[in-house]
Amino acid sequence: MTEIKGISVDEWKKKICEEAERLRPQLIQLSHSIHDEPEIGFQEFKSSAKICDFLEKQGFETERGYCDLPTSFKAVKKGTGKGPVVAFLAEYDALRGVGHGCGHNVIATCASGAFASLAKIFVEMGIAGEVRIIGTPAEEGGAGKAIMLERGGFDGVDFALMIHPTCGGESRNYINRNGRASGSLTISFTGQSAHSSAPATGINALTAAISVFNQIDMLRPLFETEDNVNGVILEGGTASNVIPGFSKSEFCIRAATMKRIDELQNMIIGCAKRAESLTGAKVQIQSEPIYAERYPCLPICE
C-alpha cells in the first residue's frame, strides 16, 4: 500500500509526527511529573491518573481499573470497520527505593504520545482497524501483564508495541530484540526468636535464608549460559543480639525459556526445603506468574 485516500503513506506518517510534535510540551511535562512522584507496582495511583487525565484532555475516553486492577487503564480509537488491532503498552511503576531507574516514566509518555498522535490521524485516514493504549502496572515485580493476559486484557490485539529507553545513542537502538523468560520467588522462614546469648533456645530464620543462598551458589556450575538467579534478603532481623525469628528473601530468575524457568524455580524450592529440614524454620514460598520469552515479529518490526 503506497496511498490511503489519495495521500501517500509517507505523507500520513508526516502528519502523525506533526501531531506528536504538537503534543511535545505536554508529553515532556507528563514524563517529568511521573518521574517526580515514583510509585511501586500496583500502587501507581497518581501515575495512572496523570496518564488518563492527559488522554482525556486529548478527547479520548479511558477505562480506569481495567482488568479489575485499580491502576490499569485502557483507551480505544476505532476506525471505519473491523481490521487489525494495534496496542501501545504503557508501563509506569518505579523501582523500590530507587525511583524511575528504568525510565518507566519515558515508556508511559511515549506510549501515550504514540497512541494520541496515531489515533487522531487514524480517523482522518478513514481505514479499518483499531488503536489501543493499555496501561500495564507492576512490571518491576508483580507480573502485571501476566495477570492481565490471564484476565483477557489483551484479547483481540493483533500486535503490541512498546518502547524502552536505553543508553548509548543510536548505536544502541534495538527494533527486533529477543527477550528471556523471567519469574520470581519469595521465600520466607519462620523460626523462633531468642537472645543471642542462648541461641539453642531459638530457631534462626536468617540462617535458613543464608543456607538457601549458599545452596544456590553451589548449583551455579549447573546453570546454562542464559540462566540468571539473583536474590536479596528483605528481612533478616532487627538487632544483632537477637536470634531472628523471621526472614524473607526475594529471587529474580531469568532463563531462555519458560520451561527452564520452571526447572530453576524447582531447584530453588528444593534449596528452601532442605534449609527448612536443616534448621527447623518453617518455610513459605510464593511465586508470581512466569513471563514467557519474547520472540519479535520481523515483518512488524520492519
Whereabouts are the PLM-identified features?
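Metal-dependent amide/peptide-bond hydrolase catalytic core
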Residues: 1-11, 210-302
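Acidic/His- and Gly-rich active-site-bordering loop/insert found
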Residues: 2-132
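Generic secondary-structure signature for well-ordered alpha-helical cores
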Residues: 21, 25-28, 32, 36-39, ...
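Conserved active-site and cofactor/substrate-binding residues in soluble primary-metabolism enzymes
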Residues: 22-25, 42, 46, 50, ...
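Conserved short loop/turn motifs at secondary-structure junctions
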Residues: 39-40, 134-138, 289-293
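Solvent-exposed beta-strand sheet faces enriched in polar/charged residues
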Residues: 65, 89, 134, 232, ...
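Residue-level "edge-of-site" marker
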Residues: 67-68, 165, 289
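Histidine/acidic-residue-rich, glycine-tolerant segments that coordinate divalent metal ions
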Residues: 71-77, 93-101, 105-106, 122-244
